Regions:
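Non-heme Fe(II)/2-oxoglutarate
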Residues: 33, 46, 187-269
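Short, surface-exposed loop/helix-turn segments at secondary-structure junctions
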Residues: 109-110, 155-166, 214-222
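Short, structured patches in soluble enzyme cores that scaffold and shape functional sites
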Residues: 98, 110-112, 123-127, 137-139
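Short, conserved beta-strand element in jelly-roll/cupin
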Residues: 114-130, 174-175, 182, 203-207
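Double-stranded beta-helix
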Residues: 130-190
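A short beta-loop-beta micro-motif enriched in histidine and acidic residues
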Residues: 107-118, 168-169, 175, 193-196
Length: 269
């Protein structure tokens, strides 16, 4: 489904933009699902940031029957589940989709620390430019050799000694609703401005197989961490994580396969 060029851009630079991957109708439907569920979970869109919120915002695992598009994008849709395998060059295992209303900026960071890797599909639900919170990335920063150089760069920049920081060379990714950005989980990224910002994201990790128990455990822990927002105060029965998605897998071959992999890993009972 993806072109050779798109796959190679992702592997070389750590990201690729997929313009119009969602139709206008799908983009509108996804925004409506995200806005409705966040408002129901937290009372408003964009609660005030707390003292220990990290990248401030409201985060909600979104895999309920009330949000059918978000539910189907996890593993029913080849544009996400199959595309993740094409980008990574191996079978994958999904996390849950996450509805987010960002209420602050983020500094340079990666989405994952451990040496597992993976891909995130990021959908901003309003138009985003440099001045309104578009994703900023450092191309190639997912590669271990470049990452080591960036750590050296960061260690000697003025901010490390309490002075004004350097502006790191980067690319701003302008998007409109319907566009999806595929991001390697080790790519350095940040966002600035445009708050509150509505988005929907999902991560896919490489399927580790069953021979390496340590790697299986690492993937399991990452998947569980991705959906356990312990700092968030919402009704876990109304937004139960995996339950409704897994219960509806019968007859959907790709979802059944994803459920089987998650059970082998110990993510699902």
């Amino acid at each position: 489904m993806l072109t050779h060029h798109q796959i190679m851009q992702f592997r070389t630079f750590g990201y690729v933009v997929l313009p119009g991957m969602l139709s206008q109708g799908e983009a509108d439907a996804l925004r409506a699902e995200v806005a409705a569920e966040l408002s129901a979970a937290f009372g408003v869109l964009g609660t005030a940031p707390g003292p220990n919120d990290g990248i401030s915002g409201d985060y909600l695992p979104l895999a309920v029957n009330r949000a059918p598009l978000s539910l189907s994008l996890i593993a029913d849709d080849p544009r996400t589940f199959l595309a993740s395998a094409e980008l990574l060059g191996s079978p994958t295992v999904p996390s849950l989709g996450t509805a987010t209303c960002f209420t602050g900026d983020s500094s340079w960071h990666t989405r994952q620390g451990p040496d597992i890797g993976g891909v995130a599909f990021w959908a901003d639900l309003e138009q985003r430019t440099a001045g309104t919170g578009a994703i900023r990335v450092i191309p190639g920063s997912h590669l271990p050799e470049f990452e080591r150089l960036l750590w050296q760069y960061g260690a000697i920049e003025p901010a490390a000694s309490g002075f004004e920081e350097w502006d790191w060379p980067h690319v701003v990714i302008d998007t409109k609703p319907g566009d999806i950005v595929a991001l390697h989980l080790h790519l350095r990224m940040c966002t600035r401005g445009g708050t509150p910002r509505l988005s929907w994201t999902i991560e896919y990790l490489p399927w580790p197989g069953v021979a390496d128990r340590d790697r299986m455990a690492a993937v399991r822990d990452l998947l569980l961490d991705e959906v356990e927002y312990d700092h968030e105060d919402y009704d876990r029965e109304r937004w139960p994580g995996w339950r409704e998605w897994a219960d509806g897998a019968a007859g959907i071959t790709s979802r059944e396969l994803a459920v089987e992999r998650l059970r082998i890993l110990g993510v699902l009972p």
